[in-house]
Every structure is written in C-alpha cells, then in structure tokens.
Amino acid sequence: MRTHPIGTGPFKFVEFKPNESIKVTRNPDYWKQGRPYLDGIDYTIVKNPSTGILTFVAGKVDMTSPYFLQVPLLKDLKSQDPDAICELVPSNVNRNVMMNRDAPPFDNAELRRVATLSLDRRAFIDTLTLGKGDIGGAMLPPPEGVWGMPLEMLKTLPGYDPDVQKNRADARKIMEKLGYGQNKHLAVKVSTRNIPPYRDPAVILIDHLKEVYIDGELEPIDTAQWLPKVMRKDYTVALNLTGNGLDDPDQTLYENFTCGAEGNYDGYCNPEFDKMVDRQSMEFDQTKRKELVWAIERKLTEDAARPILWHNRSGTCWHPYVKGYTPMVNSIYNGLRMEDVWLDR
C-alpha cells in the first residue's frame, strides 16, 4: 500500500520516487461523472520551505502544497509574487504539551498544574505566527470552529487568564510548597520532533517553564524516532502537534483523551471523563451538546491533560490560472481530492 496504493478516488497512482515526487493520473472510472477536470497531478517533494517558495515564484509549480506555508513564509512568498492567490485558514492542528503523568516528577498533579500556569499563549502566537494563531482548548476555536469554547469563557480556565504574571506567581507558590525556589530548580528534558513546527515552540516553552523554577533542556528527536518514543512514553515533557480529521467532538475527544485511545499519547485516563464524552455524544440538541463539550474542555484543562498552546493557521498559495481550489477550514486532511480544480491557460 505504501508504494502501490489502490483506491476509488478521482486520481490513480502512477509513480512514487522517495524524496522526489509523486505522480497520479485521472481515474476514468471515478464515480462522479465529469470529474476530475485535471488529467493528472505531479507532486514535487521539496524538503526546504524556502526552496519551495522559490520553486513556486519561478513558476515551476502551479500551487504550493495545501497548508504548506506558515505565516512568515506566506508573507515572504507574497512579497516575491504579489499576483499569487493565498489563503490563511485554520488547520485544526494544535500545538500542545504532554507530561508523563505515570513517572516522576509529573506524576504529581500539582507539578502538572504549575506547567499549565507557566504558559503565555499569546507570546507563542505573536512570536511564531505574527499574531495569526488562535487561543483555544481541545476543540477548534470559533468562529470557524463550531464546538470550541468562547474566548471569554476560556479566560476562566487555569492558565488562560490573560494576566500571565499572576498565573506564574501562583505557580511559583506551588513550587515553593513542593520544596523548589530561586535556589532550587527542577531540571527536566523537553523532547520534541526535530523540525521547526515542533522545535520552535519547544524553545519558547522552555523559556516559560524557567519562570516557574523549571529548567528545561531541549531534546530534539529525529522524525523517524519521534512517534515510537512518544508511544513508549519515553519522555518527561514533550512538545507535540495534534491534527484532527474534522471539527467534531467525537473524533477529537474519543481519539485523543479517552482511556486507552490510540491517540492518547500522554496516557490521561479518567473514567468519569469518559462518561462525560459518552453523554455529549448521545445529545441531539446542539446547544445542549455544546454546553457538555465546554464542561469537558474545562475538565481537561483542570486535569492538565495535554495543555493546548494554540491552534495554528496555515497558508496555501496558487497562481491565478488555477481555478476551483477551496481550502477547508476544519482540517488539513480534508479538501485534498482536487476533483474540482482546473487550469485556465
């Protein structure tokens, strides 16, 4: 399946050259009559984002990979090619912190609370996205997110109070009760995948932890080893990215936070929480279901279950002759069928 995939989509697999390209061709047996419009697609694999921008500006490709561009790169591309059509949209991918709650020192709930109180979410957003990210909980934030907690309500949760200095002062008081202080810091390793979307926020996280007597040492992990390391829970603190398949509480909550779930990488397990997730899943009234989901988000935050740093927005650019492409706002995994795309040239 990795080298000769078979499917029923608008395009059929032709060729895969590792680290070079992927080619697909129009599927004449596609179930939707008259689609796709394109005869095929050649995907060029470009590892370096800056090189990818130059490739686009030079006209060697028709569009960037969907959601390929972070905000600074998007601005760079537009400055070099003002005619490019670009959209920056929510990706339903959040940056989050995982703490190994099954091993010292973060088997202590008070220490997990300290880490939560250390966070300055606005600093992450302003530094890494030029202010274009979104503060939220586990669910995609509004307005694009249907189920996310309103910002004013978020501010009442632990660590979300905009008064970061107050939050950190409270965290230092907890640390002092635990025997730490200015002359005795807690040393931990902060593990993350060794690519910029992971590594850059991990560096900022280390700065934030330092404000509450926790000295973090960055441990960059090769991509091939990252997921196995996470699955083994071979970390103390980890900076991770979580992408959701759609904006729906069942998908997000069951997959990432219930006991034993495949995506529950930090091992959070609370049977009462699982019952809360079941209750919202059975509620037909959307308004009532939202209230149940918001109670769940509060519970996750109070339990410091994978604290969310921010929800990212990612960019896609295409040349004006590319028609029919619509970026999705509920997940980076949707809107990739390309069946409605055509070239006006």
Regions found by a protein language model. Name each.
Residues 1-36, 40, 169, 173, ...:
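Gly/Pro-rich hinge or "lid" segments in bacterial periplasmic/extracellular proteins
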Residues 109-113, 125, 162-165, 215-226, ...:
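Extracytoplasmic/peripheral linker and loop segments enriched in polar/acidic and small residues
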Residues 73-87, 232-235, 248-263, 319-325:
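Ligand-binding "clamshell"
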Residues 9-12, 22-23, 39-45, 63, ...:
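Short, well-ordered beta-strand elements
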Residues 11, 135-177, 195-200:
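Structural transition elements
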Residues 14-25, 42-103, 114, 122, ...:
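Extracellular/periplasmic solute-recognition and catalytic clefts
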Residues 86, 102, 106-148, 168, ...:
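Periplasmic-binding protein-like
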